[in-house]
UniProtKB/Swiss-Prot annotation:
InterPro entries: Ank_Repeat/CDKN_Inhibitor, Ankyrin_rpt, Ankyrin_rpt-contain_sf. PROSITE patterns: ANK_REP_REGION (PS50297), ANK_REPEAT (PS50088). SMART domains: ANK. Keywords: ANK repeat, Cytoplasm, Nucleus, Repeat, Ubl conjugation. It is found in: Nucleus; Cytoplasm. This is Ankyrin repeat domain-containing protein 37. Ubiquitinated by the CRL2(FEM1B) complex, leading to its degradation. A motif (Nuclear localization signal) lies at residues 129-149. GO terms for cellular component: cytoplasm; nucleus. The keyword Repeat applies.
Amino acid sequence: MLLLDCNPEVDSLKHLLETGASVNAPPDPCEQSPVHLAAGGGLACFLLWQLQTGADLNQQDVFGEAPLHKAARVGSMECLSLLVASDAQIDLCNKNGQTAEDLAWSCGFPECAKFLTTIKCMQTIKSREQPNKDHCVQVLRLKRSFGSEEYTSGKRKC
């Protein structure tokens, strides 16, 4: 509860939640949604609740920052993990051309930056493998075929 008393973003978020604001409604001139406020405050519990109610986790504010940027700016590994697990786009750039990873590095949170770098690499590898997976499915279908040309000497050809 001490955190609630000393963080103005939490007060704003608490007010929004009490008044029944839409989860994606930009409540202030900076167009920050409750998800932006939760991520920017490092409040994983509020963020999780917002995500469970259908909040847009890629919504950008007037600075072009998504909730992922806000979490990276404050070094909240918990919020970053929640957003990444919910399929937030990690390659979004703000109006200064910075990704969340860039912000984590520039704000002095190397562990968050390394986490985002790892996720980006994993997503890149996964996207490169996707066409290969389709090819593998086709090859597997061929392997399951028992045509006379494919099945010789008790072994199936690829």
